[in-house]
């Protein structure tokens, strides 16, 4: 059983590497076989088809790994503890991806999410649900911070939660898009 679990994890990691720099259409079963050292039959056994592998890779590497849901409940009672724990999660994820040979996590996620948008019919609904869950967690964290006097009581909790969820963490993603565009146009910028 452990061998099967390891094979499945390896397939997901190898698929992530391939999809992080190639569009969905450009990743073939032959490339998946070559990258993983696993036969097409085994890939189909674990994931049914390329779409199944891609969907599971999305869940594992996009929705589960970079989620504030990964912060344990004891750390969700303080904004500072929550924020620091989440930053550590992101650092660990970045290091794991570097070990996989992926130097820019946000660029990889951008490529994968664009492929998902174009090839997974319910991706918008899944992403929207995930986003709502993330927003609700931030709202609860900020509400806790207000009730424990960690931050002022006269703030608009929803606005501050949106600030954290959108502006702070999404800024990283959009900066990556700017990097891609600038490289494509062969220009440089400084933030």
Whereabouts are the PLM-identified features?
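Amphipathic alpha-helical packing segments from all-alpha helical-bundle domains
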Residues: 80, 102-106, 121-148, 159
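Helix-turn-helix
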Residues: 10, 18-60
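Hydrophobic alpha-helical connector segments
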Residues: 56, 70-106, 157-164
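An amphipathic alpha-helix signature
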Residues: 12, 83, 87, 135-143, ...
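N-terminal intrinsically disordered/low-complexity leader segments
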Residues: 1-6
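Hydrophobic/aromatic-rich alpha-helical bundle segments in the mid-to-C-terminal region
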Residues: 124-132, 146-191
């Amino acid at each position: 059983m452990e061998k099967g679990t390891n094979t499945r994890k390896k397939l997901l990691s190898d698929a992530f590497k391939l999809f992080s720099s190639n569009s969905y259409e450009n990743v073939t079963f032959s490339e998946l076989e070559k990258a993983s050292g696993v036969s097409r039959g085994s890939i189909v056994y674990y994931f049914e088809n390329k779409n199944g592998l891609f969907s599971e890779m999305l869940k594992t590497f996009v929705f589960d790994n970079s989620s504030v849901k990964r912060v344990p409940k004891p750390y969700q009672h303080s904004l500072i503890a929550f924020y620091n724990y989440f930053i550590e999660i992101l650092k660990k994820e970045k290091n794991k991806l570097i070990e996989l040979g992926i130097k820019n996590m946000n660029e990889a996620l951008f490529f994968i999410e664009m492929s998902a948008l174009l090839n997974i019919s319910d991706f918008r609904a899944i992403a929207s649900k995930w986003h709502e869950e993330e927003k609700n967690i931030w709202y609860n964290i900020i509400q806790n911070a207000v009730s424990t006097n960690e931050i002022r009581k006269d703030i608009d909790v929803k606005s501050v939660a949106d600030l954290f969820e959108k502006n702070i963490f999404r800024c990283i993603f959009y900066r990556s898009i700017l990097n891609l565009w600038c490289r494509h146009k062969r220009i440089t910028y400084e933030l």
